Amino acid sequence: MEKLIEIKDFSVKFETGRAVAYALNGVNLTIGKGEALGLVGESGAGKTTTALGMLNLIPQPAGKVTGGDILYEGKSVFKMSQKELMDMRGDKVAMIFQNPLTSLNPVFTVGEQIGMVLQKHKHLSKKQAIEEAGKLLEVVGIAKYRVNDFPHQFSGGMRQRVGIAAALACNPALLIADEPTTALDVTIQAQILELMKELLVKFDSSLLMITHNLGIIAEICNNVAVMYAGTIVEYGSVEEVFTNPSHPYTIGLFGSIPKLTGPRERLASIPGAVANPEHLPSGCPFHERCGVASGRCSQNASQMFQIGEHHYVACHKAGEVER
């Protein structure tokens, strides 16, 4: 598969007057053309920071890239000129944000906001851009005449559809969806996911789906990467990772999913708390919460190694955890 995005040993820290938080610690990840990759992990794992790095949007001045690189079609996003970055954002790589209410400007109509993307990247006149915005609204299931409505006149699910229309306006090569259904109820979530699946085929875009919901990964993605404390701990095809989770953290995530069939049991949970990025433990960042960790785990983190045809894990004890 041809590489679209390549993340190489990427590390980021955030400095404040009080402390330093190590958000990403040697992330390695590849997104191929036509691939739908799920990035899953608890809140604070570094998922959104990884996505922002792809767009060279790490918040400044607190955020600092301390190592590694991110390549888009072979070129470092950190060596692109400001013009190249502006041309890439929204045109070649687009993002759907978690909360559609805060990602849309309340003082502009939805048509104007979608139209701005088209004016910038496709060089359309304002009138042409608004007309095209109306067509895009129809693609995501919103009546064309609502192009002149404001964000507050839409429901949460409709606002998220507007966000999807804006992201797809220029037919991007990569669509980043940062927990796009978190703020929506379950029935609307299903509609949005079904819409995204249809549009990914229609527009032939790659996808990075950021979520903590493993069900969404199973529904829409080909491959999945599991992130913990700013590192990738397991990666593989959805089929292999879901049928044979091998990192203790991944196994813990699957174990914490409520089961709808069989006898009622106490809901399992992962002991302890998420590693503090200001005081990361030595060795494997998960060893303090791991039931099979040894002295080796507290001293040296495992490198990623292959355990299946399309399955990789970073754990000295892979395969020793009871499922």
Task: Show which residues each predicted segment covers.
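Conserved ABC transporter NBD signature motif
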Residues: V65-S76
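A short, proline-enriched helix->beta-strand linker immediately N-terminal to the Walker B motif
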Residues: A169-A173
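P-loop NTP-binding/switch modules centered on Walker-like glycine-rich loops
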Residues: I176, P180, L184-R266
